[in-house]
Amino acid sequence: MLAINLNLTVAFMLALTGVLVYRSHLMSTLLCLEGMMLSLFILMTLLIVHFHMFSMSMAPLILLVFSACEAGVGLALLVKISSTHGNDYVQNLNLLQC
């Protein structure tokens, strides 16, 4: 169990590092955020089963729902930005400009 938790923690940290390194492209940032959410979902599920906290069994499902909503909003934002600006560079965006 310890090796699985360590692997999932390393996967979460790698995805977090990817968010910090690839923050200039929106698509790469969204993929790294999805990796973070997936590793967090699996880690929460394994910890709940391991410690027999069945009262918290809905928490991973709620996290998965929010992750799906985040992915949908992120992809809609990516499509909108790509159609208006022609690329997904976050550096070229000025959010104060309408």
Swiss-Prot record:
Core subunit of respiratory chain NADH dehydrogenase (Complex I) which is composed of 45 different subunits. It comes from the Eukaryota. The keyword NAD applies. Disulfide bonds: none annotated. Its EC number is 7.1.1.2. The chain crosses the membrane at residues 1-21, 25-45, 57-79. This is NADH-ubiquinone oxidoreductase chain 4L. Pfam families: Oxidored_q2. The lineage of its organism: Eukaryota, Metazoa, Chordata, Craniata, Vertebrata. It catalyses: a ubiquinone + NADH + 5 H(+)(in) = a ubiquinol + NAD(+) + 4 H(+)(out). It is found in: Mitochondrion inner membrane. Keywords: Electron transport, Membrane, Mitochondrion, Mitochondrion inner membrane, NAD, Respiratory chain, Translocase, Transmembrane, Transmembrane helix, Transport, Ubiquinone. Core subunit of the mitochondrial membrane respiratory chain NADH dehydrogenase (Complex I) which catalyzes electron transfer from NADH through the respiratory chain, using ubiquinone as an electron acceptor. Part of the enzyme membrane arm which is embedded in the lipid bilayer and involved in proton translocation. GO terms for biological process: ATP synthesis coupled electron transport. GO terms for molecular function: NADH dehydrogenase (ubiquinone) activity. Belongs to the complex I subunit 4L family. The keyword Mitochondrion applies. It comes from Dasyurus hallucatus. Coiled coil: none annotated. It is a multi-pass membrane protein. One of its GO terms (cellular component) is respiratory chain complex I. Its main location: mitochondrion.
